[in-house]
Amino acid sequence: EIYPKQFEKLSQLSEQYSIGSAHFSTRENIQLHWVVLEDVSEIFRSLAEVGLTSREACGNSVRNVMCSPLSGVCSDEKFDSTPYALATAKFFLRNPMAQSLPRKFKFNFTCCEKHGMVRMVDVGLIPEIQQIDGSEQKGFKIFLGGGLGNRSFVGHQLEDFTPEEDLLYTSIA
């Protein structure tokens, strides 16, 4: 999530400390280029004032948790996965268990089978609903091990259905 006041602050910081433009990465991170080292602490303070951080933008950590922009509006989705993506991001942000991983680690939630990059990231999640004991149960189809590096891999399906109450435990594992 990003809000207008945060965009305004990023624009101001780009004009004041960078080259007047910002770059949006493929992981939905925003980069300011040509920043002078002496200005970095002030930039960090200014970002924090509007609820932004530079944490987990690089290094061997859980990176920005992505969610399809069609989540919540896609006619083929079983349910909106946005709250689950936000909760996952909140859990892993600044969490010590996610700070010194062997490599960067990427999550991607999508809305349905047709959209998103769930087979091209470390953990890809598609919302699913199953009938269990006569009632509808929300959960996710999970794919693991995808990547787009110099040796690309297509993720493999972990299981057909992980109930929503097990999602955090499965994500930690």
Segments (PLM) and residue ranges:
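Conserved histidines in hydrophobic membrane contexts and catalytic metal-binding motifs
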Residues: F140-F143
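Small-residue-enriched alpha-helical segments and adjacent helix-cap loops
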Residues: E1-Q137
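Internal alpha/beta scaffold segment
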Residues: L148-A173
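Residue-level recognition of phosphate/Mg2+-coordinating polar/acidic sites
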Residues: D133, G146-L148
